[in-house]
Amino acid sequence: MNVWPFETMLIMTDSEVLFFKKLQLALPEFLIFSQVQLSRIIEPSDEAGQDRRFWFNRVCRQSVDFVLIDTDCQTVLVAIELDDWTYDSQDRQRQDAKKDKALSSAGIPIMRFHAEKMPGIDMLRVDVLEVIRQFG
């Protein structure tokens, strides 16, 4: 087959686009990346020893909705998830718990917001800066 069977797809849902714009307005001094694979921001520590591949495989296919990066373009300040109706499923909650545990063990705070209860821009700024202050 000379032509591969691929097509473009949207990178974010409508709710994620709205939230992304709110993040940009609330936190203009930071860089915001969307749909970031965990394997791009965390890796198994030396403590994993020969089990590095096992731990890597636990998170390599997972992603976070948004990552806030310092202006040095290297420091991850906080991971942000926008939960929607799919968050109610037990499987999704198990996956999210695994994601939260991995990020926490790497020292990256994770914040969760619900798509139907997004905070306003001012409150979003206050909440995110408080988490950065606590963990920074």
Give the location of each predicted region.
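Conserved alpha-helical elements of sugar-nucleotide-dependent glycosyltransferases
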Residues: S15-F19, Q95
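Short secondary-structure junctions
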Residues: A26-I32
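Active-site metal-binding core of divalent-cation-utilizing nuclease and nuclease-like domains
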Residues: I11, Q35-L77
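Interdomain/boundary linker segments immediately adjacent to catalytic/signaling cores
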Residues: M1-S15
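Membrane-proximal, solvent-exposed terminal domains/tails of membrane-associated proteins
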Residues: R133-G136
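Short low-complexity, flexible loop/linker segments enriched in glycine and/or proline
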Residues: E47-G49, R125-E130
